[in-house]
């Protein structure tokens, strides 16, 4: 008994000694990325660029590919030279008041992931989950990231790009990580990638049906078909590609943002709401922007009570997100909860130091009953 107690006390002492180190590791990952995000919001990309481990990203991109050495070297040099432009592709000029937000950091020893949300203006929101490691000198480096707007990692996008740049029977081997095909199937895949490179969409759609069945049904091919649908600007092909992606991989939360516009275009608000809930669960954090999108999906599906609850929650989580206030106002107006609508409008004015003029509501038909309500009249009278 005494020995067991002694062992327990020893373990507890050891744990208490380790805790400061564990907490310091957690804080340093989080502190580093908080600093990067602060700099991005001030217009500086230098800290982000400094943290990028391009060599590690390229090793992942090239892993398993049989590339011509000259092609490999030229492609790598182009990526390295364009290092400063990488961040510019997702940190763009956005509306006044928009910002990048660090949503969470998950630490596992000397590795971690950091989830960032980018405001892309009219396009909506982009999410990147960064994979972080600590190098031999203790510096925190970015070695890859999952881009939720593309449904794949940055290294996988580079992998596809380098093979598209020089599509040969040798280079396409290893392109699809989960696929091991025959010589003939790789020859067809090389022809297909040549058509992508040359933007020869007629040849692409002639070759694609003849591919090996396992390859045709892979996530890689579904994503490639979506890419080609966008590149060709063929609306029918685009819809077919996204319909197939939804039917076969629609429950994959990493594809929720990719599928969002397609689901919106066909008015599939219930499925959109479900995929956004899956996305929220995958994030491991309640994100106000996703709640806002869920609120809009619920409103589209005529689940107005849910829309109001979700928009109100978005405001409580992140008061700086102005769009959430309008989503809440619209939902409460539809529910004829005019006191809640006025209360939300007042909160919006206070948070953003602005005055909502009468004309803003009175010129829109959606607020016709709201502007006739006693609650609205009292609010306007108090403003005069």
Description of each model-found segment:
Residues 355-384:
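Terminal, low-structured helical/coil segments at or just beyond the last alpha-helical repeat
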Residues 123-174:
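Short beta-strand edge/turn micro-motifs at domain boundaries
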Residues 180-210, 214, 221-231, 258, ...:
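Alpha-helical segment of the N-proximal tetratricopeptide repeat
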Residues 215-216, 250-251, 284-285, 319, ...:
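Short coil turns that delineate tetratricopeptide repeat
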Residues 26, 71-123, 246-251, 384:
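Surface-exposed, charged secondary-structure patches
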Residues 210-211, 244-245, 278-282, 313-314, ...:
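Canonical positions in the second alpha-helix
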Residues 223-231, 253-270, 274-316, 323, ...:
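Alpha-helical adaptor scaffolds
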